[in-house]
Design a protein with these regions (language model features):
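Peripheral, non-AAA+ core regions of ATP-driven protein-machinery
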Residues: 1-3, 10-24, 43-49, 139, ...
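Conserved ASCE/P-loop NTPase catalytic core
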Residues: 1-217, 230-239, 249-311, 316-371, ...
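Short, surface-exposed amphipathic charged segments that create phosphate/polyanion-binding patches used
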Residues: 98-109, 245-247, 537-548
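A short helix-to-beta-strand connector/capping loop
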Residues: 200, 225, 521-525
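Conserved P-loop NTPase motor cores
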Residues: 210, 227-236, 430, 466-471
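Short regulatory helix/loop adjacent to the ATP-binding pocket of P-loop NTPases
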Residues: 212-226, 513-519
Length: 585
Protein backbone atom coordinates (compact mmCIF):
# COMPACT_ATOMS: atom_id res chain seq x y z
CA UNK A 1 0.00 0.00 0.00
CA UNK A 2 1.25 3.48 -0.85
CA UNK A 3 -0.86 5.81 1.27
CA UNK A 4 0.93 9.16 1.46
CA UNK A 5 0.09 11.68 4.16
CA UNK A 6 0.88 15.03 2.62
CA UNK A 7 3.00 17.63 4.36
CA UNK A 8 2.73 21.39 4.13
CA UNK A 9 5.28 21.58 1.31
CA UNK A 10 3.13 19.26 -0.83
CA UNK A 11 0.12 21.59 -0.71
CA UNK A 12 1.50 24.43 -2.86
CA UNK A 13 4.47 25.16 -5.12
CA UNK A 14 7.76 24.77 -3.25
CA UNK A 15 9.54 28.07 -3.91
CA UNK A 16 12.18 27.95 -1.17
CA UNK A 17 14.97 27.40 -3.70
CA UNK A 18 13.97 30.52 -5.68
CA UNK A 19 14.08 33.16 -2.92
CA UNK A 20 17.39 34.56 -4.20
CA UNK A 21 15.92 34.83 -7.70
CA UNK A 22 13.01 36.96 -6.47
CA UNK A 23 15.46 39.52 -5.07
CA UNK A 24 17.33 40.02 -8.36
CA UNK A 25 17.11 43.56 -9.72
CA UNK A 26 17.32 42.35 -13.33
CA UNK A 27 13.79 40.94 -13.11
CA UNK A 28 12.56 44.45 -13.84
CA UNK A 29 14.72 44.65 -17.00
CA UNK A 30 13.29 42.08 -19.43
CA UNK A 31 15.31 41.23 -22.51
CA UNK A 32 13.98 42.35 -25.92
CA UNK A 33 13.72 38.69 -26.97
CA UNK A 34 11.53 37.75 -23.98
CA UNK A 35 8.29 37.38 -25.93
CA UNK A 36 9.98 35.18 -28.50
CA UNK A 37 11.41 33.00 -25.74
CA UNK A 38 7.97 32.55 -24.15
CA UNK A 39 6.09 32.06 -27.44
CA UNK A 40 8.59 30.28 -29.73
CA UNK A 41 6.00 28.51 -31.90
CA UNK A 42 4.00 31.66 -32.51
CA UNK A 43 7.11 33.67 -33.37
CA UNK A 44 8.24 30.99 -35.82
CA UNK A 45 4.85 31.25 -37.51
CA UNK A 46 5.19 35.03 -37.72
CA UNK A 47 8.61 34.65 -39.31
CA UNK A 48 7.12 32.34 -41.94
CA UNK A 49 4.45 34.93 -42.66
CA UNK A 50 6.87 37.86 -42.91
CA UNK A 51 9.55 36.16 -44.97
CA UNK A 52 9.60 36.89 -48.70
CA UNK A 53 8.26 34.92 -50.38
CA UNK A 54 5.86 34.08 -47.57
CA UNK A 55 4.57 30.56 -47.05
CA UNK A 56 1.08 32.04 -47.21
CA UNK A 57 -0.53 35.47 -47.12
CA UNK A 58 -2.85 34.29 -44.35
CA UNK A 59 -2.09 33.24 -40.80
CA UNK A 60 -4.48 31.77 -38.24
CA UNK A 61 -3.68 32.28 -34.56
CA UNK A 62 -5.58 30.51 -31.82
CA UNK A 63 -5.92 33.08 -29.03
CA UNK A 64 -8.69 34.89 -27.13
CA UNK A 65 -10.31 37.54 -29.32
CA UNK A 66 -9.72 40.28 -26.78
CA UNK A 67 -8.13 43.65 -27.62
CA UNK A 68 -5.21 42.96 -25.26
CA UNK A 69 -4.18 39.87 -27.23
CA UNK A 70 -4.58 41.56 -30.61
CA UNK A 71 -2.59 44.59 -29.46
CA UNK A 72 0.20 42.37 -28.14
CA UNK A 73 0.29 40.37 -31.38
CA UNK A 74 0.37 43.53 -33.49
CA UNK A 75 3.18 44.99 -31.38
CA UNK A 76 5.30 41.84 -31.62
CA UNK A 77 4.65 41.54 -35.35
CA UNK A 78 5.79 45.14 -35.70
CA UNK A 79 9.13 44.31 -34.05
CA UNK A 80 9.70 41.46 -36.52
CA UNK A 81 8.53 43.33 -39.61
CA UNK A 82 11.28 44.85 -41.72
CA UNK A 83 9.91 47.79 -43.71
CA UNK A 84 10.49 47.34 -47.41
CA UNK A 85 12.45 49.93 -49.32
CA UNK A 86 9.72 50.94 -51.80
CA UNK A 87 6.81 53.02 -50.57
CA UNK A 88 3.52 51.18 -50.92
CA UNK A 89 0.32 52.88 -51.96
CA UNK A 90 -0.88 55.45 -54.46
CA UNK A 91 -2.06 59.02 -54.77
CA UNK A 92 -5.61 59.53 -55.99
CA UNK A 93 -6.41 62.88 -57.56
CA UNK A 94 -9.95 64.06 -58.22
CA UNK A 95 -10.40 66.70 -60.96
CA UNK A 96 -13.65 67.59 -62.71
CA UNK A 97 -15.44 64.48 -61.43
CA UNK A 98 -12.61 62.32 -62.71
CA UNK A 99 -10.31 60.22 -60.54
CA UNK A 100 -6.77 59.50 -61.63
CA UNK A 101 -4.14 57.30 -60.08
CA UNK A 102 -0.40 57.85 -59.61
CA UNK A 103 2.23 56.02 -57.54
CA UNK A 104 2.72 57.49 -54.08
CA UNK A 105 5.71 59.79 -53.81
CA UNK A 106 5.68 60.21 -50.04
CA UNK A 107 4.02 59.04 -46.86
CA UNK A 108 1.80 62.12 -46.90
CA UNK A 109 0.00 60.99 -50.08
CA UNK A 110 -3.65 60.18 -49.41
CA UNK A 111 -3.48 56.44 -50.08
CA UNK A 112 0.11 55.72 -49.09
CA UNK A 113 0.67 53.05 -46.45
CA UNK A 114 0.95 54.56 -42.98
CA UNK A 115 1.93 51.62 -40.74
CA UNK A 116 3.63 48.25 -41.21
CA UNK A 117 1.10 46.56 -38.90
CA UNK A 118 -2.51 47.60 -38.30
CA UNK A 119 -4.87 45.97 -35.80
CA UNK A 120 -8.65 46.01 -35.28
CA UNK A 121 -10.80 43.83 -33.05
CA UNK A 122 -13.99 44.86 -34.86
CA UNK A 123 -14.44 46.48 -38.27
CA UNK A 124 -17.24 47.69 -40.50
CA UNK A 125 -17.03 47.84 -44.28
CA UNK A 126 -16.15 51.55 -44.52
CA UNK A 127 -13.50 51.23 -41.82
CA UNK A 128 -11.88 48.29 -43.58
CA UNK A 129 -12.15 49.30 -47.25
CA UNK A 130 -12.52 53.05 -47.10
CA UNK A 131 -15.33 54.90 -48.85
CA UNK A 132 -16.28 57.43 -51.50
CA UNK A 133 -18.04 60.56 -50.25
CA UNK A 134 -19.87 63.16 -52.34
CA UNK A 135 -21.00 66.49 -50.94
CA UNK A 136 -22.18 69.44 -53.02
CA UNK A 137 -20.69 67.82 -56.09
CA UNK A 138 -17.27 67.40 -54.51
CA UNK A 139 -15.92 63.86 -54.35
CA UNK A 140 -13.49 62.72 -51.68
CA UNK A 141 -11.91 59.34 -51.13
CA UNK A 142 -11.32 58.03 -47.62
CA UNK A 143 -8.68 55.31 -47.08
CA UNK A 144 -9.44 52.20 -45.02
CA UNK A 145 -7.36 49.83 -42.94
CA UNK A 146 -6.30 47.83 -46.00
CA UNK A 147 -4.76 50.99 -47.48
CA UNK A 148 -3.04 51.95 -44.23
CA UNK A 149 -1.50 48.48 -43.90
CA UNK A 150 -0.59 48.13 -47.59
CA UNK A 151 2.80 46.46 -47.82
CA UNK A 152 2.46 45.18 -44.27
CA UNK A 153 0.20 43.11 -42.02
CA UNK A 154 -3.42 43.51 -40.97
CA UNK A 155 -4.41 41.81 -37.69
CA UNK A 156 -8.14 41.10 -37.34
CA UNK A 157 -10.47 39.26 -35.02
CA UNK A 158 -12.10 36.25 -36.66
CA UNK A 159 -15.49 36.92 -35.13
CA UNK A 160 -15.84 40.22 -36.97
CA UNK A 161 -15.43 38.41 -40.31
CA UNK A 162 -17.61 35.44 -39.35
CA UNK A 163 -20.37 37.88 -38.43
CA UNK A 164 -19.97 39.65 -41.82
CA UNK A 165 -19.25 36.94 -44.42
CA UNK A 166 -19.43 39.31 -47.41
CA UNK A 167 -16.75 41.44 -45.80
CA UNK A 168 -14.48 38.41 -45.62
CA UNK A 169 -15.14 37.34 -49.22
CA UNK A 170 -14.18 40.76 -50.53
CA UNK A 171 -11.07 40.95 -48.32
CA UNK A 172 -9.91 37.48 -49.36
CA UNK A 173 -10.29 38.29 -53.05
CA UNK A 174 -8.31 41.51 -52.67
CA UNK A 175 -5.44 39.85 -50.83
CA UNK A 176 -5.36 36.91 -53.24
CA UNK A 177 -5.47 39.08 -56.39
CA UNK A 178 -3.21 41.75 -54.87
CA UNK A 179 -5.53 44.42 -56.16
CA UNK A 180 -7.99 46.74 -54.48
CA UNK A 181 -11.17 47.38 -56.47
CA UNK A 182 -13.53 50.16 -55.47
CA UNK A 183 -17.05 48.86 -54.99
CA UNK A 184 -20.21 50.47 -53.72
CA UNK A 185 -21.37 49.39 -50.28
CA UNK A 186 -24.94 49.67 -51.50
CA UNK A 187 -25.75 47.58 -54.57
CA UNK A 188 -28.70 49.83 -55.40
CA UNK A 189 -26.47 52.92 -55.53
CA UNK A 190 -23.40 52.67 -57.79
CA UNK A 191 -20.29 54.76 -57.26
CA UNK A 192 -20.65 58.34 -58.50
CA UNK A 193 -17.43 58.03 -60.53
CA UNK A 194 -15.22 55.31 -61.90
CA UNK A 195 -12.16 54.84 -59.70
CA UNK A 196 -9.07 52.99 -60.92
CA UNK A 197 -8.00 49.92 -58.96
CA UNK A 198 -4.80 50.12 -56.95
CA UNK A 199 -2.12 47.46 -56.28
CA UNK A 200 -2.35 45.83 -52.86
CA UNK A 201 0.29 43.81 -51.05
CA UNK A 202 -1.17 42.68 -47.77
CA UNK A 203 -0.79 39.84 -45.28
CA UNK A 204 -3.59 38.91 -42.90
CA UNK A 205 -3.43 37.51 -39.36
CA UNK A 206 -6.78 36.20 -38.16
CA UNK A 207 -7.10 35.68 -34.40
CA UNK A 208 -9.81 33.49 -32.92
CA UNK A 209 -10.83 31.03 -30.24
CA UNK A 210 -11.21 27.35 -31.01
CA UNK A 211 -14.90 27.73 -31.88
CA UNK A 212 -14.23 30.60 -34.28
CA UNK A 213 -11.43 28.66 -35.95
CA UNK A 214 -13.73 25.66 -36.37
CA UNK A 215 -16.40 27.85 -37.98
CA UNK A 216 -13.81 29.44 -40.26
CA UNK A 217 -12.46 26.03 -41.29
CA UNK A 218 -15.98 24.96 -42.21
CA UNK A 219 -16.48 28.14 -44.25
CA UNK A 220 -13.02 28.12 -45.90
CA UNK A 221 -11.63 24.56 -45.76
CA UNK A 222 -9.00 25.05 -48.49
CA UNK A 223 -7.68 28.37 -47.20
CA UNK A 224 -7.63 27.08 -43.60
CA UNK A 225 -5.53 24.12 -44.75
CA UNK A 226 -3.04 26.36 -46.58
CA UNK A 227 -2.80 29.15 -44.00
CA UNK A 228 0.03 29.30 -41.47
CA UNK A 229 -1.28 28.12 -38.10
CA UNK A 230 0.01 28.77 -34.62
CA UNK A 231 -1.26 29.33 -31.09
CA UNK A 232 -0.77 31.76 -28.27
CA UNK A 233 0.44 29.53 -25.44
CA UNK A 234 -1.47 30.69 -22.39
CA UNK A 235 0.58 28.69 -19.87
CA UNK A 236 4.26 28.14 -19.14
CA UNK A 237 5.74 24.96 -17.65
CA UNK A 238 8.51 25.83 -15.22
CA UNK A 239 10.96 23.35 -13.73
CA UNK A 240 14.07 25.48 -13.30
CA UNK A 241 15.19 28.95 -12.30
CA UNK A 242 15.69 30.17 -15.88
CA UNK A 243 12.08 29.51 -16.85
CA UNK A 244 10.75 31.06 -13.65
CA UNK A 245 12.98 34.09 -14.20
CA UNK A 246 11.56 34.54 -17.69
CA UNK A 247 8.03 34.48 -16.27
CA UNK A 248 8.91 37.03 -13.60
CA UNK A 249 10.38 39.30 -16.27
CA UNK A 250 7.18 38.88 -18.30
CA UNK A 251 5.21 40.07 -15.26
CA UNK A 252 7.48 43.11 -14.94
CA UNK A 253 7.16 43.79 -18.66
CA UNK A 254 3.37 43.91 -18.33
CA UNK A 255 3.62 46.13 -15.26
CA UNK A 256 5.82 48.62 -17.12
CA UNK A 257 3.51 48.69 -20.13
CA UNK A 258 0.57 49.39 -17.81
CA UNK A 259 2.56 51.98 -15.81
CA UNK A 260 1.97 49.94 -12.65
CA UNK A 261 4.35 48.91 -9.86
CA UNK A 262 5.86 45.43 -10.10
CA UNK A 263 6.08 42.79 -7.37
CA UNK A 264 8.65 43.06 -4.59
CA UNK A 265 10.65 39.99 -3.55
CA UNK A 266 8.18 38.95 -0.84
CA UNK A 267 5.19 39.28 -3.20
CA UNK A 268 6.39 36.73 -5.76
CA UNK A 269 5.45 33.57 -3.78
CA UNK A 270 1.90 34.88 -3.31
CA UNK A 271 1.56 35.80 -6.98
CA UNK A 272 2.92 32.41 -8.07
CA UNK A 273 0.53 30.62 -5.69
CA UNK A 274 -2.37 32.50 -7.25
CA UNK A 275 -1.05 31.72 -10.73
CA UNK A 276 -0.83 28.00 -10.07
CA UNK A 277 -4.37 28.04 -8.65
CA UNK A 278 -5.47 29.68 -11.91
CA UNK A 279 -3.77 27.04 -14.08
CA UNK A 280 -4.50 24.16 -11.72
CA UNK A 281 -0.92 22.87 -11.66
CA UNK A 282 2.01 23.55 -9.32
CA UNK A 283 4.46 23.60 -12.24
CA UNK A 284 2.40 25.70 -14.63
CA UNK A 285 2.12 29.49 -14.68
CA UNK A 286 -0.32 31.63 -16.68
CA UNK A 287 0.74 33.76 -19.64
CA UNK A 288 -2.60 35.51 -19.95
CA UNK A 289 -2.23 39.30 -20.18
CA UNK A 290 -5.78 39.64 -18.87
CA UNK A 291 -4.96 37.61 -15.75
CA UNK A 292 -1.74 39.42 -14.89
CA UNK A 293 -3.32 42.82 -15.58
CA UNK A 294 -6.05 42.05 -13.07
CA UNK A 295 -3.58 40.97 -10.38
CA UNK A 296 -1.34 44.00 -10.81
CA UNK A 297 -4.13 46.56 -10.94
CA UNK A 298 -5.93 45.19 -7.90
CA UNK A 299 -2.72 44.88 -5.88
CA UNK A 300 -1.57 48.37 -6.88
CA UNK A 301 -4.61 49.79 -5.05
CA UNK A 302 -3.04 48.60 -1.76
CA UNK A 303 0.49 49.65 -2.69
CA UNK A 304 2.08 52.84 -1.38
CA UNK A 305 5.58 52.52 -2.83
CA UNK A 306 7.16 51.76 -6.19
CA UNK A 307 6.74 48.01 -5.74
CA UNK A 308 3.88 45.75 -4.70
CA UNK A 309 4.83 44.30 -1.32
CA UNK A 310 3.88 40.90 -0.02
CA UNK A 311 1.54 42.56 2.48
CA UNK A 312 -0.23 44.46 -0.31
CA UNK A 313 -0.56 41.29 -2.39
CA UNK A 314 -1.90 39.31 0.59
CA UNK A 315 -4.41 42.05 1.42
CA UNK A 316 -5.62 42.17 -2.17
CA UNK A 317 -6.11 38.39 -2.38
CA UNK A 318 -7.91 38.25 0.97
CA UNK A 319 -10.20 41.13 0.03
CA UNK A 320 -11.01 39.48 -3.29
CA UNK A 321 -12.01 36.22 -1.60
CA UNK A 322 -14.17 38.18 0.83
CA UNK A 323 -15.72 40.30 -1.93
CA UNK A 324 -16.65 37.26 -4.03
CA UNK A 325 -17.44 34.95 -1.11
CA UNK A 326 -21.05 35.78 -0.21
CA UNK A 327 -22.58 32.88 -2.12
CA UNK A 328 -20.09 30.34 -0.77
CA UNK A 329 -20.73 31.51 2.80
CA UNK A 330 -24.48 31.13 2.40
CA UNK A 331 -24.03 27.58 1.11
CA UNK A 332 -21.78 26.80 4.08
CA UNK A 333 -24.42 28.22 6.43
CA UNK A 334 -26.91 25.71 5.05
CA UNK A 335 -24.62 22.93 6.26
CA UNK A 336 -23.68 24.54 9.57
CA UNK A 337 -27.35 25.20 10.37
CA UNK A 338 -28.13 21.55 9.49
CA UNK A 339 -30.40 22.41 6.61
CA UNK A 340 -28.08 20.25 4.53
CA UNK A 341 -27.09 17.19 6.54
CA UNK A 342 -23.34 16.60 6.50
CA UNK A 343 -21.63 14.70 9.31
CA UNK A 344 -17.98 15.44 10.08
CA UNK A 345 -17.68 13.13 13.09
CA UNK A 346 -18.82 9.61 13.95
CA UNK A 347 -19.52 6.61 11.73
CA UNK A 348 -22.38 5.61 9.40
CA UNK A 349 -23.06 2.52 7.30
CA UNK A 350 -23.46 3.25 3.60
CA UNK A 351 -22.89 7.00 3.91
CA UNK A 352 -19.82 8.95 2.83
CA UNK A 353 -18.75 12.56 2.31
CA UNK A 354 -17.93 13.15 -1.34
CA UNK A 355 -16.65 16.50 -2.61
CA UNK A 356 -18.23 18.67 -5.28
CA UNK A 357 -17.31 21.88 -7.09
CA UNK A 358 -20.15 24.37 -7.43
CA UNK A 359 -20.16 26.79 -10.37
CA UNK A 360 -23.00 29.28 -10.74
CA UNK A 361 -23.48 31.06 -14.10
CA UNK A 362 -22.43 34.68 -13.76
CA UNK A 363 -20.44 34.08 -10.57
CA UNK A 364 -16.67 34.55 -10.94
CA UNK A 365 -15.53 32.03 -8.32
CA UNK A 366 -16.11 28.29 -8.11
CA UNK A 367 -16.24 26.84 -4.62
CA UNK A 368 -16.31 23.40 -3.10
CA UNK A 369 -18.65 21.75 -0.66
CA UNK A 370 -19.16 18.23 0.69
CA UNK A 371 -22.01 16.11 -0.65
CA UNK A 372 -23.52 13.18 1.22
CA UNK A 373 -23.70 10.02 -0.84
CA UNK A 374 -25.79 7.22 0.62
CA UNK A 375 -26.27 3.60 -0.36
CA UNK A 376 -29.02 1.27 0.82
CA UNK A 377 -28.84 -2.49 0.20
CA UNK A 378 -31.65 -5.03 0.46
CA UNK A 379 -32.42 -8.52 -0.82
CA UNK A 380 -33.04 -8.33 -4.54
CA UNK A 381 -32.01 -9.38 -8.02
CA UNK A 382 -28.60 -7.69 -8.25
CA UNK A 383 -29.79 -4.37 -9.67
CA UNK A 384 -27.73 -1.23 -9.01
CA UNK A 385 -30.18 1.66 -8.89
CA UNK A 386 -28.66 5.01 -9.80
CA UNK A 387 -31.30 7.32 -8.31
CA UNK A 388 -29.85 10.35 -10.11
CA UNK A 389 -30.19 8.56 -13.45
CA UNK A 390 -33.69 7.30 -12.68
CA UNK A 391 -34.80 10.82 -11.79
CA UNK A 392 -33.15 12.17 -14.98
CA UNK A 393 -30.74 14.23 -12.87
CA UNK A 394 -27.62 12.24 -13.77
CA UNK A 395 -25.49 12.89 -16.85
CA UNK A 396 -23.87 10.37 -19.17
CA UNK A 397 -20.41 10.62 -17.60
CA UNK A 398 -21.87 9.97 -14.14
CA UNK A 399 -23.70 6.93 -15.53
CA UNK A 400 -20.46 5.67 -17.05
CA UNK A 401 -18.73 6.00 -13.67
CA UNK A 402 -21.50 3.97 -12.04
CA UNK A 403 -21.11 1.15 -14.57
CA UNK A 404 -17.32 1.09 -14.13
CA UNK A 405 -17.77 0.89 -10.37
CA UNK A 406 -20.15 -2.07 -10.72
CA UNK A 407 -17.76 -3.86 -13.07
CA UNK A 408 -14.92 -3.57 -10.55
CA UNK A 409 -17.04 -4.96 -7.72
CA UNK A 410 -18.40 -7.89 -9.72
CA UNK A 411 -14.88 -8.78 -10.86
CA UNK A 412 -13.37 -8.56 -7.37
CA UNK A 413 -16.09 -10.68 -5.77
CA UNK A 414 -15.69 -13.33 -8.51
CA UNK A 415 -19.41 -14.00 -8.66
CA UNK A 416 -20.82 -16.67 -10.94
CA UNK A 417 -24.26 -15.07 -10.84
CA UNK A 418 -25.89 -11.77 -10.01
CA UNK A 419 -25.66 -10.37 -6.49
CA UNK A 420 -28.61 -11.44 -4.32
CA UNK A 421 -28.89 -7.78 -3.29
CA UNK A 422 -30.31 -4.65 -4.84
CA UNK A 423 -28.37 -1.47 -4.11
CA UNK A 424 -29.67 2.09 -4.35
CA UNK A 425 -27.13 4.95 -4.61
CA UNK A 426 -27.93 8.65 -4.48
CA UNK A 427 -26.60 12.13 -3.77
CA UNK A 428 -28.70 13.21 -0.79
CA UNK A 429 -30.34 16.65 -0.92
CA UNK A 430 -29.21 17.17 -4.51
CA UNK A 431 -31.87 18.81 -6.64
CA UNK A 432 -29.95 19.73 -9.78
CA UNK A 433 -28.21 17.77 -12.49
CA UNK A 434 -25.18 15.72 -11.45
CA UNK A 435 -22.51 14.79 -13.98
CA UNK A 436 -18.90 13.71 -13.99
CA UNK A 437 -17.15 10.70 -12.51
CA UNK A 438 -15.18 12.42 -9.74
CA UNK A 439 -17.47 10.87 -7.11
CA UNK A 440 -17.21 7.29 -8.39
CA UNK A 441 -14.62 6.34 -5.75
CA UNK A 442 -16.87 7.72 -3.00
CA UNK A 443 -19.86 5.85 -4.45
CA UNK A 444 -17.88 2.62 -4.57
CA UNK A 445 -16.82 3.01 -0.93
CA UNK A 446 -20.43 3.67 0.11
CA UNK A 447 -21.59 0.58 -1.81
CA UNK A 448 -18.92 -1.63 -0.23
CA UNK A 449 -19.83 -0.28 3.21
CA UNK A 450 -23.51 -1.08 2.67
CA UNK A 451 -22.82 -4.56 1.27
CA UNK A 452 -20.50 -5.41 4.17
CA UNK A 453 -22.65 -3.58 6.75
CA UNK A 454 -19.48 -1.85 8.00
CA UNK A 455 -19.59 1.85 8.99
CA UNK A 456 -17.57 4.62 7.31
CA UNK A 457 -15.67 7.29 9.22
CA UNK A 458 -17.52 10.57 8.59
CA UNK A 459 -14.49 12.67 9.54
CA UNK A 460 -12.91 11.87 6.20
CA UNK A 461 -14.11 13.10 2.80
CA UNK A 462 -12.98 11.56 -0.47
CA UNK A 463 -12.75 12.52 -4.13
CA UNK A 464 -11.48 10.74 -7.22
CA UNK A 465 -12.63 8.42 -9.97
CA UNK A 466 -11.81 4.73 -10.36
CA UNK A 467 -11.26 2.47 -13.33
CA UNK A 468 -12.44 -1.13 -13.72
CA UNK A 469 -9.32 -2.35 -11.89
CA UNK A 470 -9.79 -0.12 -8.85
CA UNK A 471 -7.00 2.28 -9.76
CA UNK A 472 -7.65 5.85 -8.67
CA UNK A 473 -7.69 8.48 -11.41
CA UNK A 474 -7.20 12.26 -11.12
CA UNK A 475 -10.13 14.67 -11.11
CA UNK A 476 -10.53 18.44 -11.21
CA UNK A 477 -11.27 21.17 -8.69
CA UNK A 478 -8.97 19.83 -5.96
CA UNK A 479 -8.29 23.21 -4.34
CA UNK A 480 -11.95 24.12 -4.06
CA UNK A 481 -12.93 20.64 -2.84
CA UNK A 482 -10.31 20.46 -0.09
CA UNK A 483 -10.97 24.00 1.09
CA UNK A 484 -14.73 23.46 1.08
CA UNK A 485 -14.56 20.46 3.44
CA UNK A 486 -11.87 22.09 5.56
CA UNK A 487 -14.02 25.20 6.09
CA UNK A 488 -16.95 23.14 7.37
CA UNK A 489 -14.69 21.18 9.72
CA UNK A 490 -13.01 24.38 10.91
CA UNK A 491 -16.33 26.07 11.65
CA UNK A 492 -17.44 23.06 13.69
CA UNK A 493 -14.05 22.69 15.36
CA UNK A 494 -11.01 20.81 14.12
CA UNK A 495 -10.41 17.53 15.94
CA UNK A 496 -7.14 16.44 14.35
CA UNK A 497 -8.89 13.39 12.86
CA UNK A 498 -10.52 15.11 9.90
CA UNK A 499 -9.11 15.07 6.41
CA UNK A 500 -9.52 14.36 2.73
CA UNK A 501 -8.45 11.43 0.56
CA UNK A 502 -7.37 12.44 -2.96
CA UNK A 503 -5.80 10.68 -5.96
CA UNK A 504 -2.00 10.67 -5.84
CA UNK A 505 -1.92 12.03 -9.40
CA UNK A 506 -3.71 15.16 -8.14
CA UNK A 507 -1.01 16.22 -5.67
CA UNK A 508 0.68 18.38 -8.31
CA UNK A 509 -2.59 20.28 -8.77
CA UNK A 510 -2.73 21.56 -5.19
CA UNK A 511 -2.25 25.22 -4.33
CA UNK A 512 -4.22 25.51 -1.12
CA UNK A 513 -4.95 28.43 1.17
CA UNK A 514 -2.40 29.39 3.82
CA UNK A 515 -4.97 28.62 6.52
CA UNK A 516 -5.40 25.05 5.36
CA UNK A 517 -1.66 24.58 4.96
CA UNK A 518 -1.11 25.74 8.53
CA UNK A 519 -3.76 23.34 9.82
CA UNK A 520 -1.96 20.47 8.07
CA UNK A 521 1.37 21.60 9.56
CA UNK A 522 -0.25 21.66 13.03
CA UNK A 523 -1.73 18.15 12.52
CA UNK A 524 -5.24 19.57 12.86
CA UNK A 525 -6.25 18.42 9.37
CA UNK A 526 -4.85 15.82 7.00
CA UNK A 527 -4.75 15.12 3.28
CA UNK A 528 -3.87 11.62 2.09
CA UNK A 529 -2.91 10.65 -1.46
CA UNK A 530 -3.67 7.13 -2.74
CA UNK A 531 -3.29 5.12 -5.94
CA UNK A 532 -5.89 2.38 -5.42
CA UNK A 533 -9.36 2.07 -3.94
CA UNK A 534 -8.09 -0.65 -1.59
CA UNK A 535 -5.89 1.97 0.11
CA UNK A 536 -8.86 4.20 0.94
CA UNK A 537 -11.04 1.49 2.50
CA UNK A 538 -8.91 0.81 5.64
CA UNK A 539 -8.86 4.52 6.48
CA UNK A 540 -12.62 4.77 6.06
CA UNK A 541 -13.76 1.45 7.57
CA UNK A 542 -10.79 0.18 9.65
CA UNK A 543 -10.92 -3.05 7.59
CA UNK A 544 -8.72 -4.14 4.69
CA UNK A 545 -10.36 -5.01 1.40
CA UNK A 546 -8.50 -8.31 1.12
CA UNK A 547 -5.77 -10.20 2.94
CA UNK A 548 -5.48 -12.06 6.22
CA UNK A 549 -8.07 -11.91 8.99
CA UNK A 550 -11.50 -10.37 8.68
CA UNK A 551 -11.71 -8.31 5.48
CA UNK A 552 -14.40 -6.39 3.64
CA UNK A 553 -14.32 -8.79 0.73
CA UNK A 554 -14.75 -11.79 3.02
CA UNK A 555 -17.57 -10.07 4.91
CA UNK A 556 -19.45 -9.31 1.69
CA UNK A 557 -18.99 -12.86 0.41
CA UNK A 558 -20.34 -14.25 3.69
CA UNK A 559 -23.41 -12.03 3.45
CA UNK A 560 -23.91 -13.10 -0.16
CA UNK A 561 -23.73 -16.76 0.88
CA UNK A 562 -26.30 -16.20 3.64
CA UNK A 563 -28.64 -14.36 1.29
CA UNK A 564 -28.27 -17.08 -1.35
CA UNK A 565 -29.17 -19.78 1.20
CA UNK A 566 -32.25 -17.87 2.28
CA UNK A 567 -33.26 -17.38 -1.34
CA UNK A 568 -32.85 -21.11 -2.04
CA UNK A 569 -34.92 -22.01 0.99
CA UNK A 570 -37.76 -19.63 0.08
CA UNK A 571 -37.79 -20.90 -3.48
CA UNK A 572 -39.90 -23.96 -2.44
CA UNK A 573 -43.65 -23.61 -1.69
CA UNK A 574 -44.45 -23.61 2.02
CA UNK A 575 -46.11 -27.08 2.05
CA UNK A 576 -42.92 -28.63 0.62
CA UNK A 577 -40.80 -26.72 3.11
CA UNK A 578 -43.08 -28.06 5.89
CA UNK A 579 -42.77 -31.63 4.62
CA UNK A 580 -39.03 -31.23 4.29
CA UNK A 581 -38.88 -29.94 7.82
CA UNK A 582 -40.90 -32.89 9.33
CA UNK A 583 -39.03 -35.56 7.43
CA UNK A 584 -35.71 -34.33 8.75
CA UNK A 585 -36.63 -35.01 12.37
Amino acid sequence: MTITKLTRTDLAPDLEAYQALFAQAELSHPAPSLSGDLQPRLFYGLEQLLYTPAVSSFMLVKAPEEPEYLQWLAAETRTLHEPAAPLYGVRYEVTDAQVTLAPAQGAEDNFASTAPVVMADWVEAEQLFGCVRQFNGAITLQPGLVHQANGGVLVLSLRTLLAQPLLWVRLKNMVTRQRFDWLSMDESRPLPVSIPSMPLSLKIILVGERESLADFQEMEPELAAQAIYSEYEDTLQFADADTLKAWCQWVWQNAQQLALPGPAADAWPLLIDEGTRYTGDQETLPLSPLWITRQLREAAAFCEGEEITGEAMQTMLARRVWREGYLAERMQDEILQEQILIETEGECVGQINALSVIEFPGHPRAFGEPSRISCVVHIGDGEFIDVERKAELGGNIHAKGMMIMQAFLMSELELEQQLPFTASLTFEQSYSEVDGDSASMAELCALISALANVPINQSIAITGSVDQFGRVQPVGGLNEKNEGFFTICQQRGLTGKQGVIIPAANVRHLSLSHELRQAVADNQFAIWAIDDITEALPMLTQLMWDGEGQTLRQTIQERIAQATQQETRHRFPWPLRWLGGTSSN
